[in-house]
Amino acid sequence: YYPLDEGWPGRASVVHASPDVSFAWDFPYDDYFTYKGGLGGNTDGEPFQYMREIRQHGQDVSLTLTIDPHVTDEHLIAIANDLRPFGRVFLRINHEATGNWFSFNKRCTYQEVADFFVRASRVIKEHAPNVQTIICIGGIEDLSKEEMEKEAEFAQTIPAADIWSVDKYMALHWGWPYDVAEHGGDTHSRGTVADTYEKTKRSFERFRYLNGGTPKPMTMAEFNADGDVTGPYEQADMVREFCDKLEQEQADWFSAFTFYQFRDRGRLGLEIEDPNNSEVGIAQPVLDTYKEIIHRDWFRPQMEKQEGEVQLPVTLRWTNSEDAEGLAMPLHFEKNPTFCEAVFEEDSNLMLELNGRWFYKAPGTKTVDMMAAFFEKPLDGPADMTLKIFAPTATGEN
């Protein structure tokens, strides 16, 4: 969101296209798709369509927004008003703020960037109390030091934020696509799982200290090992090893990570983009690894079942992905089914869970085929099961 810049709201690589660009961050402002809301904008396009789809599917929006620190409070209030209808929103403002690659760091001092985060966090939450802000900084990057990176400037952001975050890549090729990650190169890095884990934990401990000993949710808003450095097999191995460590240590100080990302033109994705067709992804070994991890008990969402039966009709409440009320319907299967369908008469918007598999029913959809719940976990005889039904917002907005 750089509304004061020439060329706005066009994407930087389009309105500032130049043969002289040799690095992803060489444009006047950050080369992401632009935020079309804000002062004088609207919520018809992106990212708002994405946000509606995410909430229709029962998840919470985690929005990363780079913002020119020179914008006025009026701009921030307009952003807050954009976000008010979207329930719990995690807003990551000017992420990786102790770095030097994003445009906001190139046009402001670290002190100014930190001051802006505190101001933006305060103003946006005043006008949109559903928003939780995320401070994303380097944290502890050198294990021999007690203080975090740029602590003098950014200590104030720790109590101002609702959620703490560090972006950690166990391997990363930031020179992509302009060069190749080869031995001796200076546009990529590779660390270890143990080192990444320890830096993340030490960052949390330092953040807690700077918050007067009171903890807040600790996340990694970006996490992966770049297959462009490691190759696809060791990428999967490193992701598995990190998650094994979280589970083995029962790391309840750690709240979440965002795997970056689902599909990538390089080799960061669970899928890589098919170079012949950008609409198609090619699954990587880490996709199966990630699928196995999120189905472990330690990483699965918890559901509490109330005793007794309810009297229909009932109202299904959806607050966010960790706070909702649904229906549990007992089912008896004589054997592994040949067909398993749910048929609906109403234009409801539902998330359904059966045998550990989630299904989405959009408004207008009449039949949901749930046989996929048994492809990988077939029944070997009679079984009593439970169909769980939740009703997120049908429009994606409150």
Listing of model-derived features with the role each one plays in the protein:
Residues 1-85:
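N-terminal carbohydrate-binding/catalytic regions of secreted carbohydrate-active enzymes
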Residues 2-5, 36-51, 74-81, 141-156, ...:
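Alpha-helical scaffolding within the catalytic cores
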Residues 32, 41-43, 169-228:
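Glycoside hydrolase catalytic-domain groove-lining segments
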Residues 63-65, 102, 172, 176, ...:
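Active-site clefts of carbohydrate-active enzymes
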Residues 80-110, 133-141, 220:
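Active-site groove signature of glycoside hydrolases
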Residues 122-149, 213-228, 254-264:
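Aromatic-lined carbohydrate-recognition surfaces of secreted/lumenal glycan-active proteins
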Residues 332-333, 347-398:
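Beta-strand-rich ligand-recognition modules
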